[in-house]
């Protein structure tokens, strides 16, 4: 970020900002929905408090609460889905049809954030085709202009894939080819358990109840929400029949689900939010102070986030200065590159051939770090091991998150090529 540089604070600054703006958009969307429907007259009489429900519920989910702090692709994705819902609600409230351009912008930038944005956008397309109100819109140029805006926003991602063998589309789309029906109950259980955890248990129940109430409504916006929710749910369930659905994939639905809570009359939504906030506090407290000593297997905050600055400091002390640090796993390479001072980091993996970073020549020497959790040795076709050194541990408050083997290695040549295209010299973090 412009004011904090490449620091943890700078990288995470836009998380809370986007969550705050997205919350305002969601509350305004709820207000417009309430004001446009006589069916909600009783609820609307409670005014602004009722419209606040979606914003409070969304921010009480563990996924969104933590997402504002740790910054994942889901953070901008949730914001753009909130912007999309706000834009559509303005259209259905009789505002200028130029809001379709903002719908297209939201859809395109949401896709750039994470490809799962296509699912609720496909739900919007289904609503346009399946309902009379939607087909009336299709007779005007505005939805088509919005689609053009979306395509323009998506164009850089598509162009990059077109010039790089469609690699990211094949990787993400290739998941649909996974098929292990014998593990269906395991995958379904993981999908259900993941949502109960990321939404928080009572908010998950609240989402289910909200969809039940949506099914009873006949107004345009309720039908639109149903399309944007049920179509992606059907895709996730179908995928879970034969393959794993990552717990964070359905987070794309959380803005629409939170908005649906407006039509739930029960007061226990406050208790649901309180439980979600309590879970958030517990997770953040564990990440910061680790009051409960858990193994990395059970403590995700320790396993993924614990002790990185101290670990890299230990690496720099124990490995000779002015030598190359090497990682053959992209997560470790990224952490080393972010925290290391005045030292080059070389990443080695097939994915790096698709990036515009400088490559290394074969024969280069350096120190390879590998997690002991991988339970294997460095690939002998890629590296010549010259020596092995004592492991270096990454820990937080004396709890060991992981241990890393340290090898002095030389990059092997692949065929007759002098340059190793599967390597990348990562840019130094200038803080």
Question: Model segments located where?
Answer:
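Short helix- or helix-capping micro-motifs
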Residues: 51-62, 107, 111, 125
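Membrane-proximal, lumen/periplasm-facing interface regions of secretory-pathway glyco-
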Residues: 247, 269-321, 330-353, 369-408, ...
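Transmembrane-helix motifs of polytopic, lipid-linked glycan transferases
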Residues: 13-40, 83
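Specific aromatic-rich, kink-prone transmembrane helix
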Residues: 25, 76-93, 99-107, 257-260
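Membrane-interface transmembrane helices that cradle and orient dolichyl/undecaprenyl
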Residues: 31-34, 44-45, 84-100, 209, ...
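Short acidic/glycine- and proline-prone juxtamembrane loop motifs at membrane-interface regions
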Residues: 63-77
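Transmembrane-lumen/periplasm boundary regions of multi-pass, lipid-linked membrane glycan transferases
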Residues: 121-219, 237
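Hydrophobic/aromatic-rich transmembrane helices and adjacent perimembrane loops
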Residues: 230-233, 242-270
């Amino acid at each position: 970020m412009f004011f904090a540089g490449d620091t943890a604070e700078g990288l995470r600054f836009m998380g809370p900002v986007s969550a705050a703006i997205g919350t305002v958009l969601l509350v305004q969307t709820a207000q417009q929905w309430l004001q446009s429907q006589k069916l909600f007259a009783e609820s609307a009489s409670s005014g602004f408090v009722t419209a606040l429900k979606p914003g409070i519920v969304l921010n009480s989910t563990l996924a969104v609460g933590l997402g504002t702090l740790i910054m994942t692709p889901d953070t901008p994705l949730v914001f753009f889905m909130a912007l999309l819902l706000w834009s559509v609600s303005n259209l259905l409230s009789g505002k200028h049809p130029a809001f379709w351009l903002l719908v297209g912008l939201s859809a395109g930038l949401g896709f750039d954030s994470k490809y799962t944005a296509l699912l609720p956008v496909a739900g919007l397309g289904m609503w346009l085709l399946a309902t009379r109100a939607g087909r009336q819109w299709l007779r005007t140029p505005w939805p088509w202009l919005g689609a053009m805006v979306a395509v323009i926003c998506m164009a850089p991602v598509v162009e990059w894939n077109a010039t790089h063998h469609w690699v990211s589309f094949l990787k993400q789309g290739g998941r649909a080819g996974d098929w292990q029906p014998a593990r269906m109950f395991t995958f379904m259980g993981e999908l259900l358990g993941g949502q109960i955890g990321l939404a928080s248990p009572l908010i998950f129940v609240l989402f289910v109840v909200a969809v039940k109430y949506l099914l009873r409504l006949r107004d345009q916006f309720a039908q639109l929400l149903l399309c944007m929710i049920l179509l992606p749910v059907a895709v996730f369930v179908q995928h879970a029949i034969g393959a794993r659905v990552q717990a964070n994939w359905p987070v794309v639905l959380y803005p629409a689900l939170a908005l649906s809570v407006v039509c739930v009359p029960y007061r226990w939504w406050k208790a649901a939010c309180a439980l979600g906030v309590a879970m958030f506090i517990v997770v953040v407290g564990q990440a910061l102070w680790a009051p409960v000593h858990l193994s990395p297997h059970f403590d995700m905050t320790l396993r993924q986030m614990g002790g990185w600055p101290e670990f890299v400091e230990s690496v720099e002390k124990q490995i000779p200065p002015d030598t190359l640090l090497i990682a053959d796993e992209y997560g470790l390479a990224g952490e080393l590159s972010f925290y290391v001072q005045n030292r080059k980091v070389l990443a080695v993996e097939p994915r790096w051939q698709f990036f515009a970073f400088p490559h290394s020549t074969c024969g280069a020497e350096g120190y390879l770090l590998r997690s002991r959790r991988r339970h294997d040795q460095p690939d002998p076709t890629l590296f010549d091991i010259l020596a092995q050194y004592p492991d270096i541990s990454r820990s937080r408050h004396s709890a060991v998150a992981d241990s890393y083997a340290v090898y002095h290695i030389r990059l092997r040549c692949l065929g007759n090529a002098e340059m190793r295209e599967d390597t990348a010299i990562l840019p130094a973090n200038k803080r």
